[in-house]
Amino acid sequence: MNFTVPVQAIQSIWSVGKESDDAIAEACKPPFCIYFSKKTPYTVTNGSNADHGDDEVRQMMRGLLYNSSCISAQGHTPLALYSTAMLYPPMYGSCPQYVKLFDGSGSESVDVISSSYFVATWVLLVVVIILVFIIISFCISN
């Protein structure tokens, strides 16, 4: 299994007085890149200024210090990116598995074909084993 951790990118937005573009958002596409975008307008508070990020940007950057793309309510684990048990929205970031399973608006979809083949293979194996036991018991009883 390949557990390649995607690149993480944060929206490079300036204050109202400076021009911003969305080049990073256009370049960063899942599953190889996870893009964190601001949800509120740029605000200068708590001693920050127009050039060094507002509170929301600082919070997003703080999350990167954990080397994690998402932190769930259960805490951070290195495999949080790939957890299929992600039932709650992340407290920070955007967990790809959560987005794929529960967000119908995205272009990403869950790869159910490979997992279906895996389940079908095991079911077939169990059926074959049961049939072998039935045949053996039939032969022994005769």
UniProtKB/Swiss-Prot annotation:
<feature type="transmembrane region" description="Helical">
    <location>
        <begin position="118"/>
        <end position="138"/>
    </location>
</feature>
<keyword id="KW-1015">Disulfide bond</keyword>
<comment type="subunit">
    <text>Homodimer.</text>
</comment>
<keyword id="KW-1043">Host membrane</keyword>
<keyword id="KW-0325">Glycoprotein</keyword>
<feature type="glycosylation site" description="N-linked (GlcNAc...) asparagine; by host">
    <location>
        <position position="46"/>
    </location>
</feature>
<feature type="disulfide bond">
    <location>
        <begin position="70"/>
        <end position="95"/>
    </location>
</feature>
<keyword id="KW-0261">Viral envelope protein</keyword>
<keyword id="KW-0946">Virion</keyword>
<keyword id="KW-1133">Transmembrane helix</keyword>
<feature type="glycosylation site" description="N-linked (GlcNAc...) asparagine; by host">
    <location>
        <position position="2"/>
    </location>
</feature>
<protein>
    <recommendedName>
        <fullName>Truncated non-functional hemagglutinin-esterase homolog</fullName>
    </recommendedName>
</protein>
<dbReference type="GO" id="GO:0019064">
    <property type="term" value="P:fusion of virus membrane with host plasma membrane"/>
</dbReference>
<feature type="disulfide bond">
    <location>
        <begin position="28"/>
        <end position="33"/>
    </location>
</feature>
<dbReference type="GO" id="GO:0019031">
    <property type="term" value="C:viral envelope"/>
</dbReference>
<feature type="topological domain" description="Virion surface">
    <location>
        <begin position="1"/>
        <end position="117"/>
    </location>
</feature>
<keyword id="KW-0812">Transmembrane</keyword>
<dbReference type="GO" id="GO:0016020">
    <property type="term" value="C:membrane"/>
</dbReference>
<dbReference type="InterPro" id="IPR007142">
    <property type="entry name" value="Hemagglutn-estrase_core"/>
</dbReference>
<dbReference type="GO" id="GO:0016788">
    <property type="term" value="F:hydrolase activity, acting on ester bonds"/>
</dbReference>
<feature type="glycosylation site" description="N-linked (GlcNAc...) asparagine; by host">
    <location>
        <position position="67"/>
    </location>
</feature>
<keyword id="KW-0472">Membrane</keyword>
<feature type="topological domain" description="Intravirion">
    <location>
        <begin position="139"/>
        <end position="142"/>
    </location>
</feature>
<dbReference type="Pfam" id="PF03996">
    <property type="entry name" value="Hema_esterase"/>
</dbReference>
<dbReference type="GO" id="GO:0046789">
    <property type="term" value="F:host cell surface receptor binding"/>
</dbReference>
<comment type="similarity">
    <text>Belongs to the influenza type C/coronaviruses hemagglutinin-esterase family.</text>
</comment>
<dbReference type="GO" id="GO:0020002">
    <property type="term" value="C:host cell plasma membrane"/>
</dbReference>
<keyword id="KW-1032">Host cell membrane</keyword>
<dbReference type="GO" id="GO:0055036">
    <property type="term" value="C:virion membrane"/>
</dbReference>
<keyword id="KW-0348">Hemagglutinin</keyword>
